[in-house]
């Protein structure tokens, strides 16, 4: 396993604990991002469906508004000069709000009326009904246009947010988590190898001590058999174990 495939870290119990915590954190982050992506995708599909419905309705409303304009011009004559002369400031205005979906801020536009209707008395002489119908149809068209602008802006914002979230999920799932898992496997392998080496070393030391003990007991028996007087061992004296070397 090359160093590029795993995180450079000294194998130890502490490193193993750290890697386990990092792995758990990465898995939790991946799961949360997947839930976020699912929530964004659900809202994305809802907005897409709403855009299609609004565009279909928009076509009908604009067609009806065009017919109303033709009827009003036929009945009341050319009233464009009157409209232009009465223009002072916009009566229909737009304000923006913010909506939050799984941490993503979406702009929401809504229209509102400000001031009085400058064209309230237009059409009193003739064509009043057609002009009123014309204003209603174009007011509906403005409302749908504002709604469509809000939906399309949210659509683009969500599309970009979903792509970014999915890229993060893929990076965690296919790069970060496998790298941590390989690092954890490396640490476990190294620790197991150390334990085997330590076990083998202790086993050889015990075997060496056993051989020395048997040899010492055998020498003691031979000396007793030869009639030598043996001094009792001083239990309080400091004894230093002989360094045991083995091949």
Swiss-Prot record:
Record localization: Membrane; Cytoplasmic vesicle, Clathrin-coated vesicle membrane; Cytoplasm, Cytoskeleton, Microtubule organizing center, Centrosome; Cell projection, Cilium
MF terms in GO: proton-transporting ATPase activity, rotational mechanism
InterPro entries the UniProt entry points to: V_ATPase_D
Major subcellular site: membrane
Keyword hit for DNA-binding: no
Topological type in the membrane: Peripheral membrane protein
GO biological process: cilium assembly; endosomal lumen acidification; Golgi lumen acidification; intracellular pH reduction; lysosomal lumen acidification; protein localization to cilium; proton transmembrane transport; regulation of macroautophagy
GO cellular component, one term: extrinsic component of synaptic vesicle membrane
Key words, A-Z: Cell projection, Cilium biogenesis/degradation, Cytoplasm, Cytoplasmic vesicle, Cytoskeleton, Hydrogen ion transport, Ion transport, Membrane, Transport
Domain of life: Eukaryota
Family (UniProt): Belongs to the V-ATPase D subunit family.
Subunit structure as annotated in this protein's UniProt entry: V-ATPase is a heteromultimeric enzyme made up of two complexes: the ATP-hydrolytic V1 complex and the proton translocation V0 complex. The V1 complex consists of three catalytic AB heterodimers that form a heterohexamer, three peripheral stalks each consisting of EG heterodimers, one central rotor including subunits D and F, and the regulatory subunits C and H. The proton translocation complex V0 consists of the proton transport subunit a, a ring of proteolipid subunits c9c'', rotary subunit d, subunits e and f, and the accessory subunits ATP6AP1/Ac45 and ATP6AP2/PRR. Interacts with SNX10.
Role of this protein: Subunit of the V1 complex of vacuolar(H+)-ATPase (V-ATPase), a multisubunit enzyme composed of a peripheral complex (V1) that hydrolyzes ATP and a membrane integral complex (V0) that translocates protons. V-ATPase is responsible for acidifying and maintaining the pH of intracellular compartments and in some cell types, is targeted to the plasma membrane, where it is responsible for acidifying the extracellular environment. May play a role in cilium biogenesis through regulation of the transport and the localization of proteins to the cilium.
Stored NCBIfam families: V_ATPase_subD
Identification of the protein by name: V-type proton ATPase subunit D
Organism of derivation: Homo sapiens
């Amino acid at each position: 396993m090359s160093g590029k495939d795993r995180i450079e870290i000294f194998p130890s119990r502490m490193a193993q604990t750290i890697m386990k915590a990092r792995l758990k954190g990465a898995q939790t982050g991946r799961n949360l991002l997947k839930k976020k992506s699912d929530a964004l995708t659900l809202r994305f599909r809802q907005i897409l469906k709403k855009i299609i419905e609004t565009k279909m309705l928009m076509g009908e409303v604009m067609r009806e508004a065009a017919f109303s304009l033709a009827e009003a011009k036929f009945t009341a004559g050319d009233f464009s000069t009157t409209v232009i002369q009465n223009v002072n400031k916009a009566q229909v205005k737009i304000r923006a709000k913010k909506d939050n979906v799984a941490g993503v801020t979406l702009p929401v536009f809504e229209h509102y009326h400000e001031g009085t209707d400058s064209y309230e008395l237009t059409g009193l002489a003739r064509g009043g009904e057609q002009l009123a119908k014309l204003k209603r149809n174009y007011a509906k068209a403005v409302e749908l246009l504002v709604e469509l602008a809000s939906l399309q802006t949210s659509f683009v914002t969500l599309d970009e947010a979903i792509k970014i979230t999915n890229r993060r999920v893929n990076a965690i799932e296919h790069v970060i988590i496998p790298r941590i898992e390989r690092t954890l496997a490396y640490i476990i392998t190294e620790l197991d190898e150390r334990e085997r080496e330590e076990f083998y070393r202790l086993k050889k030391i015990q075997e060496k001590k056993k051989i020395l003990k048997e040899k010492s007991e055998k020498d003691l028996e031979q000396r007793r058999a030869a009639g030598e007087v043996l001094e009792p061992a001083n239990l309080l004296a400091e004894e230093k174990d002989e360094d045991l070397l083995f091949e």
